[in-house]
Amino acid sequence: MGIFDKLFGALKKTKDNFSGKLRVLFSKNKLGDEFYEELEEILISSDVSYSTAAEVVERVKEQAIDGKLSDEEYVTNLLRSILVDILEESEVEPPEYPCVIMLVGVNGVGKTTTVGKLAHYFLSQGKTVTVAAADTFRAAASEQLSVWAQRAKVRIVKHEEGSDPSAVIYDAVSSAKAKGTDVVIIDTAGRLHVKENLMNELRKMDRVVSREFPEADFLKLLVLDATTGQNAVNQARVFDEAVELDGIVLTKLDGTAKGGFIFSLSSELSLPVLYAGVGEKMEDLEEFDSRAFVDAIL
C-alpha cells in the first residue's frame, strides 16, 4: 500500500467531516453572501483559523464564475485548487546531504517514535543515518530511542540520563562528520512552549549544530499531534519564534476529524508539512504530499 492509499485511509474522519458538510451546503442551494458565509463556517469548524478561512473564501469569490456556485463539482474543484495552492506556497526543496534534522515539540506528540520512523525512511532512501538521544531528562528516553534505532538498524549516540543535551549533539555531529554520515536526526526533550528556559536550551542546541557542522543542511522540524487541532498553530508560532522552524512533522493524522489547521500553518506561518505519520508501523511515515492530502479530504 502506497502513502497515497494510506493517506486516504488515515484521513477518512477528516473527509467525512469536511466533504459531508460541503454536500449539505450544496443541497441548500444557497447563493451569494449566504453561500460564502456558510462555506467560511464549514472551514472554521474543520479547524481552519478565522483568517485563513476568510482568505480561502476571498479566493473563491475572486475566481468563481458567476452562476456556478450551485455546481457542486465546479466549486469542489475550485476549492481543491485553492487549498493545494495555499499548501504549495510554503513548500520547500527536500534536504541536501549531509543534513541534520532536529525534532522539537511539546511532551507526548511522538517525537522519539518519529525519530525512529524518519531514520527508517532515510535508510530506505539509501542514506546512512545516526540518531542522537538529546532528550536526557525524560526517564528511559534514550532507552526508548535505542529500541527504535535497533529496529531501524541505525547508529545511536547517547549519554547518561541528566547529561547536557548539547554535549550529546556535539558528539553526534562530530562523529557524523568523521564518518561521512548522510543524516543525523536529533531527539529533544518535550517542553512546554511557555517555558523560556527550555526554549533557551533549544537555542543553545541550535547554535551547537550550526557551529560544529556548518556544511550540513540543518532542518528544525516541529512535531505536531494532528489531533491537537487549532492549538497546533499556537505551538508552531512560539517554537518558530524561538528557533526559526523549517517545517512540520505531523503525527496521528489518522486520528483526527479536523485537519484544517494544516492550511493555517502554511498560510499564516509559511511552515510546510514535510512528513506525515499515518499509522503505527515503522514504515507509516512518508513525505507529505499537498495534492494527495487535499484530494483525500475532498
Q: Which ranges hold each PLM region?
A:
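Glycine-rich phosphate/diphosphate-binding loops and the adjacent beta-loop-alpha structural elements
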Residues: E62-I65, R191, E244
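Short glycine-/small-residue-rich Rossmann-like dinucleotide-binding loops
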Residues: N107, A189, D225
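Alpha-helix N-cap/helix-start motif
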Residues: F4, A53, E72, K111-V115, ...
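Conserved catalytic-core segment of NTP-binding enzymes
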Residues: P165-K179, V194-L298
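Short, glycine/acidic-enriched loop or turn micro-motifs at the edges of active sites
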Residues: T136-R138, E161, G190, T228, ...
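Primarily NTPase-proximal linker/entry elements flanking Walker-type ATP/GTP-binding cores
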Residues: K13, N17-A134, A141-I186
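N-terminal accessory targeting/assembly segments
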Residues: M1-F18
